[in-house]
Every structure is written in structure tokens, then in C-alpha cells.
Swiss-Prot record:
Entry's localization field: Cell membrane
Transmembrane feature ranges: 32-52, 76-96, 113-133
Record-given protein name: CASP-like protein SELMODRAFT_406854
Superkingdom of the organism of origin: Eukaryota
């Protein structure tokens, strides 16, 4: 096997992982990702709106009891987590708009932004799952009391 054929085999073997990484990173700055971020922001806004405006009124032994979201620590926690999710989604939607509009930026900078978004998504997902588990456990404790 000659030197030229060895280098072409090495290039083909090394190019495949690089191409798959680039294709994966391209997915983070696609218009579909932007639409998903906007949909998440809309759903978080609806969650907050329903949570804050809902009231439940019951009469027990001629005593009028009004239940609102701020009476329960679990619902306050849910409102805070929904607000954080809303802010995060809007922030990343803005980052995607900047990434989609700035096609004149160097590829290395775009890769860095894609990796930043990927890592931030992973960290946020872990934290959001932890918050969701805490909210559900607090909610179940409130249900047993």
C-alpha cells in the first residue's frame, strides 16, 4: 500500500466522525429548533397564566375557603420552575435568531455557539428534571396531609 492510499484511508476514517459531529451540530441551529423553543415559551406562558389566575372556592361548615396558588409551596415552586423555563426558552430563541441571521460569521464561532447551546441544554435538562421531581414529591406530600 502506497503513501497516497494510506493517507486517503486515514482521511476517510477521520472524516466520518467529523462529518457526523458537524451534522449533529447543524441540527441545533435549525429553524425547527427555533420553533420548538418558541412553542416551549408559549406553553410555559400558558402554564403560568393558568396557575396564577386559577382559584378554587369551597364552603366547609359554613366557612368560605379560597384556594389560590400562593397558598401551596409546591405550586409556588412550580411557578418558579415554569418562569425559569420560560426565560431559558426565550434566551435560546434569541440566540438561535442571532445564529440564523449571522451567516457571515466564521464556522469556528458557529461551532462554539452550537456546543454552548448543546451543553446548556444538557445542564438545564438535568436541573429541570430535578426540579420536576422535587415538585411532584412535594405535591404528593401535600396530597397525603
Amino acid at each position: 500500500m502506497g503513501v497516497a492510499s494510506q493517507s486517503s484511508v486515514a482521511n476517510e476514517a477521520g472524516a466520518a466522525p467529523e462529518a457526523s459531529i458537524q451534522q449533529t451540530l447543524r441540527g441545533f441551529s435549525s429553524p425547527t429548533s427555533l420553533l420548538l423553543r418558541i412553542a416551549t415559551a408559549v406553553l410555559c406562558t400558558l402554564t403560568l397564566a393558568f396557575l396564577v389566575t386559577s382559584k378554587e372556592r369551597k364552603e366547609i361548615a359554613s366557612i368560605d375557603i379560597v384556594a389560590i396558588w400562593s397558598n401551596s409551596k409546591a405550586l409556588i415552586f412550580l411557578a418558579v420552575v415554569s418562569g425559569i423555563c420560560l426565560g431559558y426558552s426565550l434566551l435560546h430563541a434569541a440566540v438561535f435568531l442571532v445564529m440564523l441571521s449571522g451567516n457571515r460569521k466564521p464556522l469556528a464561532r458557529k461551532k462554539a455557539l452550537d456546543w454552548m447551546v448543546f451543553l446548556a441544554d444538557q445542564v438545564f435538562f438535568k436541573i429541570f428534571c430535578w426540579f420536576s421531581i422535587r415538585v411532584s414529591s412535594r405535591r404528593s406530600k401535600a396530597g397525603f396531609v
